[in-house]
């Protein structure tokens, strides 16, 4: 029984290795559809609840859907190059906070689910180094083109606090608007991927180079983000 199990494991390992060699041969093109998630944020991006008190709230990573495909050419045993096209929703979010409406009357605004959504078409050009047959390190250049307006939204609730510290919740409304953000975003993606039986797990960090907006007296924010995708290779 043990002998049969060992033989079966060796056969499976051999089949996996053969499939990897056949499905990603040198000198061939392949198409890799992908789907996954992007975790994005803007650097130097804050809101000030109270300028006098210096109450600063920095933005955080926000998750967004992404999907697309790469076309890869395996140039040598160790080098490949790919060009991709993806849809990705990027942006940022803030933790919930309160702003003062009237300190004398102890009236406040409670802000919840404050976030920005920016849709892009991303075009990454990647140079891939095959560290092993399955493990790949990569670096490249990527251009992102904004689709439509950059939007933000949050829920705003009127609050009133009594002298005992109790909070009374009043009207709630949804606030929406558009952001000033450049249409083109250039970044440098670096990452790794692992492939087994044509299934590819891919992780990248995109270093933002473009200043997203120019505000006098403030450091201009840049859009950097992580992407995590799963794909499948089809050799042409």
Question: What role is predicted for each listed range?
Answer:
Residues 2-7, 70, 74-77, 205:
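N-terminal capping/interface segment
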Residues 1-25, 29, 34, 230-236:
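Bacterial Sec-dependent N-terminal signal peptides
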Residues 26, 74-78, 132, 197-199, ...:
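Outer-membrane beta-barrel channels and translocator barrels
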Residues 29, 65, 79, 121, ...:
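Hydrophobic core residues within well-ordered beta-strands of beta-rich domains
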């Amino acid at each position: 029984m043990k002998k049969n199990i060992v033989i079966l494991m060796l056969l499976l390992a051999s089949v996996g290795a053969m499939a990897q060699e056949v499905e990603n041969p040198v000198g061939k093109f392949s198409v890799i559809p992908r789907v996954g998630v992007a975790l994005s944020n803007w650097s130097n991006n804050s809101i000030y609840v109270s300028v006098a008190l210096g109450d600063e709230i920095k933005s955080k990573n926000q998750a967004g859907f992404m999907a697309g495909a790469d076309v890869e050419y395996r140039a040598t045993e160790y080098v490949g190059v790919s060009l991709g096209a993806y849809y990705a929703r990027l942006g940022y979010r803030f933790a919930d906070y309160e702003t003062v409406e009237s300190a004398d009357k102890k009236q406040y605004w409670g802000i919840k689910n404050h976030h920005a959504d920016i849709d892009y078409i991303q075009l990454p050009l990647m140079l891939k180094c095959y560290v092993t047959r399955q493990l790949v390190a990569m670096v490249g250049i990527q251009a992102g083109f904004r689709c439509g307006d950059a939007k933000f939204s949050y829920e705003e609730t009127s609050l009133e606090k009594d002298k005992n510290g109790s909070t009374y919740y009043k009207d709630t409304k949804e606030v929406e608007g558009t952001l000033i953000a450049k249409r083109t975003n250039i970044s440098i993606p670096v990452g790794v991927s692992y492939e087994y039986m044509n299934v590819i797990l891919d992780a990248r960090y995109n270093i933002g180079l473009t200043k997203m907006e120019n505000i006098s007296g403030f450091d201009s924010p840049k859009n950097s983000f992580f992407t995590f995708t799963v794909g499948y290779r089809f050799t042409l």
